[in-house]
Amino acid sequence: MGDPEAPNTIVEYFSLTCGQCAKFHANVLPKIKKNLIDTGKAKFISRDFPLNNLAILAHMVTRCAPRKHYRPYVNTLFKNFSSWTRKSDPIAALKQIAKLGGMGPEKFDACLQNERLYQGMRKKMSEYTKKFAVDSTPTIIVNGVKVDGDFSSIEKMINK
């Protein structure tokens, strides 16, 4: 998100089943967008870091959607966090959200069976853990430095 040539880079590692990540997307990300991305000071990169099997499946669904639907899917899943993560059958709830976004049941089922995507996601998580010491979500890295996930810490690092 933002100008690829922006002078600063904010990287977010997140899990779709992380309540703190949902709060970050609701409260902090809009401030980052308004004050840092829209002003050209920074670009924002989201990286999947699913913390459990349900999160892996949810992240897989966002990746199976057309690229232009990725951010809307993530936003929808976070906005409806409690309604799908706490269901007795969260996969059915996830399938319903995917359907609303235009993903049919066949594509949804095929997506969840995609072993290559699943293994690729696990591999990336391992890389992020080794390279950036990511071990929880949300993890925020600004210009290569891990910072707290509040807006003031992020802005302070950008303005350094």
Where are these regions (language model features)?
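Stable alpha-helical elements in mature extracytoplasmic
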Residues: 6, 17, 25-28, 57, ...
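C-terminal cap of thioredoxin/glutaredoxin-like
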Residues: 15, 96-160
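A short, structure-level motif marking secondary-structure boundaries and short turns
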Residues: 16-19, 78-81, 109-110
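Residue-identity detector for threonine
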Residues: 9, 17, 39, 62, ...
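Extracytoplasmic thiol/disulfide redox context detector
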Residues: 1-52, 122-131, 160
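Structural alpha/beta surface segment adjacent to cysteine/selenocysteine redox centers
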Residues: 22-99
